[in-house]
């Protein structure tokens, strides 16, 4: 990526992150009182998708039992929402949080097919998430860091967000745009398809096949020695072997 492209991307992402940051003490939203308490919440319906938003920190654990605990400032519990609708667990808030000592969600689940993080939220796995097909999405300054074991993983990252993956998969689909990053050098895949544009970066590790397309100041970096490689470099895009 050229110096001017990096500067423009950094400027745009800074503006996005400022608009999406919910834990900055700018006086907008509810301020936590600093008295942290942990409360268990019941989940009465089945779900196989999770959507996290509004700057919350979520820790995911695949388990035989389903459970959900909220660790947050005492006065924030009433505005943190956790509800299942049409098989989707939505974790969010009714109001913005301007400052908090803690705003953690600890979720244990059995099976999952889709995880989406948006609006400055952070998502982490505490163990390896096993699934046949898994769809992952980060946007609007959010971060996701997962260890996975899948047949197929389809991931997308946009608007200054970061997605970091480790583990193993048979096939990886990766799509990054608008200054976002997909960091999957520690995810061992057999077949990978990667598309990056608008100042985004993708790093991956593939053994058998690679299809890569980079345009508009984007970079795709790959580890491994795939036997079949198809590369398409657009305007100021780079595809680089590591």
Regions found by a protein language model. Give the residues of each.
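Intrinsically disordered, low-complexity terminal regions
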Residues: 1-158, 162-177, 181-242
